[in-house]
Amino acid sequence: MEVLEQMRMLLREKAILFGQYEQETLRLDAVDDIVDAVQARQALIDKINGLDRRIAAIGESSAYGARCFHIGKNQCDYAGLTEAEQAVFRVGQEVFAIMTRIRELEDGIPGKMAVIQEQLQEKIKKNNVNGKFTGYLKQMGQGSKGVLYDKRR
């Protein structure tokens, strides 16, 4: 029973991490959040990979560990499982459901990136206009000494 409970807890933690990964994926459509979201996703992937190694180790530890591994992967008949095993199966289903939602979100990322690219280009254009204005003031002799930077104001 200890192996089964350990598998359930690891799968539950994996589901939580995938849920966080999903939230970070949703942040990829905000220009200002994209770098943070990509870094957060990578950190979550590293944690998930660690959990996968621990789950695989349980599967390799014994015959019952292998059974628990297959239950967590939903590679068995639900009706033939004990109540505790069914709990592991359900957590495994939760992991797969989140993974499916993430795949669907990631299918839309190229479109989101195109929108982000347009937004960034627009920001660059706005900044270029401000730079041109500052250059114009400097050319007129007002940039460093005149109206724009007058210390008395």
PLM regions and their residue ranges:
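Proteins with a high burden of low-complexity, intrinsically disordered sequence enriched in S/T/G/P/A and R
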Residues: 1-2, 15, 63-68, 73, ...
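Long, hydrophobic N-terminal alpha-helical segment
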Residues: 1-54
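Heptad-repeat register of long alpha-helical coiled-coils used for dimerization/oligomerization
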Residues: 4, 31, 38, 45, ...
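Short terminal interaction segments
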Residues: 81-153
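Carboxylate-rich helix-loop segments that flank metal/cofactor sites and access channels
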Residues: 56, 60-87
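Amphipathic alpha-helical coiled-coil segments
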Residues: 43-59, 90, 95-105
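Intrinsic-disorder/low-complexity regions
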Residues: 51, 73-76, 149
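Heptad-repeat coiled-coil alpha-helices
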Residues: 16, 20-23, 27-30, 50, ...
